[in-house]
Amino acid sequence: MDMSSIASRLGLSGSRPVVRKAAELRRLCDVTFDSSVLGIGEVCKAIICLEIAASKFQVIFDRAEAVRMSGMSEKAYIRSFNALQNGLGVKTTLDVRELGIQFGCVRLIPFVQKGLSLYKERFLAALPPSRRASTDFGRPVFTAAAFYLCAKRHKLKVDKLKLIDLCGTSSSEFTTVSTSMADLCFDVFGIAKEKKDAKSIKGSRELLDVLPSKRKHDDDSDSSGESSGDDQDELDLPTYKRHKKMEKEAYNDWKSSVLSNKQTKPDPAKPRKQAQLNFKKKPSDMALEVSSAAN
């Protein structure tokens, strides 16, 4: 398949420098090594070259569509992308300043730079000396994750999917790096969780409406500040146990009402037999019966 047709299907037909750079990378790949040894087909190789070129020119690349066109899984595509990138000796870089300008968050630049340096120091301090030299912090995923965490800390909206596409990684790897940064540098990237009142949450309000004992407890505490021991014991139970106890009490109430209705209800009247009717016969009728019997 031609490079220009693949680029048009990926929405890159208008970016001619990207297409020319991808064609150059494809020729370099054909000269340098045989990509079939790595298990990369021609179509997949062209798509990966387009993604590398798009990352160099800071052009948004639709990785989901690229994975679908390549006929590979996301993990296999990322593995092939890294192998081809290392074989070509090309490294994608992501500048914090360009991210700040692109997303309109210029004031985050010093915070991101400080967080990256602090994360690098603490991460290397936790590693053994033999592994420190092989650690690569120049990958774009670290810059993108630090930028996303700083934006989240300062309550600024940043498109996470767009960041993942720019750094050329998977969502799982981005989440892993973000979690590692938030754990090691909580003072820079962490977000303090505020404890919210249960009554202010919609789901909790519905739960309070379902539990009459909880409403009674709240009303008594607001009025007198005291509550009964039974209500307190019931509130100490877990939610599912309270629900089970309420169902059992409702069943017992229903059972007692059925039994009380059965006791108070009068016995049904027994069916009565119809008495035989014995009418007095007239003398004329008796004479007719005797005559008929004689005949």
UniProtKB/Swiss-Prot annotation:
Residues 212-295 are annotated as: Disordered. One of its GO terms (cellular component) is nuclear origin of replication recognition complex. Residues 220-236 have a biased composition (Acidic residues). Its main location: nucleus. One of its GO terms (molecular function) is DNA binding. CDD domains: Orc6_mid. Keywords: DNA replication, DNA-binding, Nucleus. GO terms for biological process: DNA replication initiation; pollen development. The keyword Magnesium does not apply. Component of the origin recognition complex (ORC) that binds origins of replication. DNA-binding is ATP-dependent. The specific DNA sequences that define origins of replication have not been identified yet. ORC is required to assemble the pre-replication complex necessary to initiate DNA replication. Belongs to the ORC6 family. This is Origin of replication complex subunit 6.
